[in-house]
Amino acid sequence: MIFTFKPMTQLHAEIISTWKYQEPYNFYDFETDAEIIDELLNGDYFCAFNDVEILIGYFCFGNSARVPGGYAAGIYEKEDMLDIGLGLEPSKTGKGLGRVFVKEGIDYLKQQLDIRKFRLVVASFNQRAIKVYVENGFVQKGKFLSKVNGTDIEFICMIKAN
């Protein structure tokens, strides 16, 4: 195992809230404010660390992983799976870590929550992430629009069951 996972802490929430991604991925940036810190500390987020205990990313699950436009599109009507979201530290993206990061995060959730079906949504332009999800057994189940900073962004719903 390359990564270890631990509950989100105040310190790590503050660090993650400062992460800034390069365009076009910068729409994944968090705002550094108390509301975001509270969100990261709501119990649905956990940190991922590398083998020398450096914070490398995070996972979230449940309502925290859902995109608002998905409700109107009906993708969250089926409750028999766990919604997940994730993020790698910006300097680690595009370096080939994604496949193992996603696999180990899902394995951790399976172990902790005894869940076997997962759902995630990803911006349709994020081909790097889509490739990683497909490599991890996710299949596309539909598309929908959701507003991000006042702009409609197309998202893809993907499911993994096993």
Predicted regions and their residues:
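Acetyl-CoA-dependent GNAT
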Residues: 10, 22-91, 112, 161-162
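Residues at or immediately flanking beta-strands
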Residues: 2-4, 83, 117-119
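A short beta-loop-alpha structural element at the N-terminal edge
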Residues: 2-15
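Conserved glycine-rich acetyl-CoA-binding loop
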Residues: 86-103, 124-131, 135
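C-terminal "cap" of GNAT-fold acetyltransferases
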Residues: 115-119, 123-127, 136, 143-162
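Conserved acyl-CoA
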Residues: 100-117
